[in-house]
């Protein structure tokens, strides 16, 4: 099917605009917004689907609404953050005439305050997800730069043992300090497995099904 001349002219004009170097920073912000929205939806929707149907009570409509709300919030926040981060980086580079490493930190710091500063479940999950990876990366950077002696043996087994020891101790004795979705997951694993009445809720279901 051949596109009408008006559509071909429009596409030609858009592609010509996209190829102009002078608009690259602004266009990169727009594409960053697009990619943030898509990526946020792709990673949040499956997670929200599983967590909602595993742990949330309520009608099907309420569950679907919760899934859509969580997906929208994650997607919208990530899109705004990428847009703001790229814009602030471009602005600093333009003002100072070149790019410095500090630009990334300053831009992301401001974006984090403005976009992810609201203390809710989704922002909390995202920040904690990043925290674990930041700590790992900083340890590796410390070894790379010589600030931390390179270990002779792989420290990962000790790290894993420490993490699991701490999280189960917190769950058993200081549960309110843990993030709600982690509490739900650990309750399913370590508390619900202590209770059963017959084969149905021992093997087939987690909890007894209400009689109709």
From Swiss-Prot:
Residues carrying covalently attached carbohydrate according to the record: 206
Record carries keyword Disulfide bond: no
GO cellular component: peroxisomal membrane
Matching InterPro entries: Pmp4
Membrane topology: Multi-pass membrane protein
Subcellular location: Peroxisome membrane
Domain of life: Eukaryota
Primary location recorded for the protein, binned into one broad class: membrane
UniProt keyword list: Glycoprotein, Membrane, Peroxisome, Transmembrane, Transmembrane helix
The keyword Transmembrane appears for this protein: yes
Bilayer-spanning residue ranges: 97-117, 153-173
Cross-referenced PANTHER family: PEROXISOMAL MEMBRANE PROTEIN 4
Quaternary data: Interacts with PEX19.
Record-stated family: Belongs to the peroxisomal membrane protein PXMP2/4 family.
Protein name: Peroxisomal membrane protein 4
Gene source species: Bos taurus (Bovine)
Gene name linked to the record: PXMP4
């Amino acid at each position: 099917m051949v596109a009408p001349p008006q559509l071909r002219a429009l596409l030609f004009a858009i592609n010509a605009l996209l190829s102009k170097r002078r608009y690259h920073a602004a266009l990169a912000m727009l594409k960053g917004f697009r990619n943030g929205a898509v990526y946020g939806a792709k990673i949040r929707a499956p997670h929200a689907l599983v967590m909602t149907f595993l742990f949330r009570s309520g009608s099907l409509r309420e569950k679907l609404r919760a899934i859509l709300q969580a997906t929208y919030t994650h997607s919208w926040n990530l899109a705004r953050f990428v847009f703001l981060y790229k814009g602030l980086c471009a602005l600093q580079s333009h003002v100072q005439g070149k790019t410095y490493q500090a630009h990334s930190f300053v831009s992301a710091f401001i974006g984090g305050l403005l976009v992810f500063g609201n203390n809710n479940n989704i922002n909390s999950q995202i920040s904690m997800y990043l925290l674990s990876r930041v700590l790992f990366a900083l340890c590796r950077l410390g070894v790379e730069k010589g600030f931390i002696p390179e270990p002779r043996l792989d420290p990962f087994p000790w790290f894993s043992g420490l993490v699991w020891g701490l999280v189960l101790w917190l769950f058993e004795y200081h549960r309110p300090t843990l993030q709600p979705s982690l509490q739900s997951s650990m309750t399913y694993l370590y508390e619900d497995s202590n209770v059963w009445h017959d084969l149905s809720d021992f093997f087939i279901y987690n909890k007894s099904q209400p009689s109709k």
